[in-house]
Amino acid sequence: MFMINVLTLIIPILLAVAFLTLVERKVLGYMQFRKGPNVVGPYGLLQPIADAIKLFIKEPLRPATSSISMFILAPILALTLALTMWIPLPMPYPLINMNLGVLFMLAMSSLAVYSILWSGWASNSKYALIGALRAVAQTISYEVTLAIILLSVLLMNGSFTLSTLIITQEQVWLIFPAWPLAMMWFISTLAETNRAPFDLTEGESELVSGFNVEYAAGPFALFFMAEYANIIMMNIFTTTLFLGAFHNPYMPELYTINFTIKSLLLSITFLWIRASYPRFRYDQLMHLLWKNFLPLTLALCMWHVSLPILLSSIPPQT
């Protein structure tokens, strides 16, 4: 029975990932005054399926000097961790209702660094290794601010359980009292998922393609799917934290529709940013975090700690 539950979570995620690639190409196309994919199927709707078939029937090449076990294990680990992070997300009911759901998600996103590092190292290519080291430095750095922002939100929430956020936001979305946190959170999620304008790991002009430069066919597709699954997951997480949808237990589908629309709009914002902004320089990327975001988030965290004490009130209890 549990396997059926897992499959009912994984299959829609994989479908969402497939169609997000199509949405991305369409949105970028229209933003650049062109059509995007429109040949395979009506309005190009079958394009992701054609892409998947093409990628998975190609021969998976690997460099002769690569470390085989790690080279194959890295993309599998990347996708597994990307799918595992969906377990505690309330939509409106999570697969497993964890007491420390937020902590679980932080731990899983930290583990995802290993797949990037292994892929870069096992490829035995200078470009891949430099791309991997950049990605690891970027991911680890931005996780610091993500953790502090999460702590501030959880102080308002009063619980580490993600489902409690639905109750906390019945009266007002947390984006209103905590808009500076929400802005920094959104920018940090862009950096965490290695998206433009923070896609330094894929600097085509200098690194060819980044840590996945030696990958082809199936393993490359797994990395690609992991990246897009993480993008959707981060947007869903943002919706849960700052744009909580109203949940009526008698009509849970209303929550799901509300929640899906918000997540889709956030995903399109990701694509809009990609179409609009040029890439950061690497030192600017690190400067933004360590010199700007970190002091601000620490100050706001202290503010959120002191406010309930100042007003001698307590956060909502569960």
Swiss-Prot record:
Annotated PROSITE patterns: COMPLEX1_ND1_1 (PS00667), COMPLEX1_ND1_2 (PS00668)
A Gene Ontology CC term for this entry? mitochondrial inner membrane
**Domain of life assignment:** Eukaryota
One BP annotation, GO:
mitochondrial electron transport, NADH to ubiquinone
Q: Which reaction does it catalyse?
A: a ubiquinone + NADH + 5 H(+)(in) = a ubiquinol + NAD(+) + 4 H(+)(out)
Q: Which residues cross the membrane?
A: 2-22, 68-88, 100-120, 147-167, 172-192, 217-237, 253-273, 294-314
The protein's Enzyme Commission number:
7.1.1.2
This protein's membrane topology, according to the annotation, is:
Multi-pass membrane protein
- Main localization, broad class: mitochondrion
Q: Which PANTHER family match?
A: NADH DEHYDROGENASE SUBUNIT 1, NADH-UBIQUINONE OXIDOREDUCTASE CHAIN 1
Function according to Swiss-Prot or TrEMBL: Core subunit of the mitochondrial membrane respiratory chain NADH dehydrogenase (Complex I) that is believed to belong to the minimal assembly required for catalysis. Complex I functions in the transfer of electrons from NADH to the respiratory chain. The immediate electron acceptor for the enzyme is believed to be ubiquinone.
- What HAMAP family does this protein map onto? NDH1_NuoH
**Official protein name in the record:** NADH-ubiquinone oxidoreductase chain 1
The protein's organism comes out as: Ovis aries (Sheep)
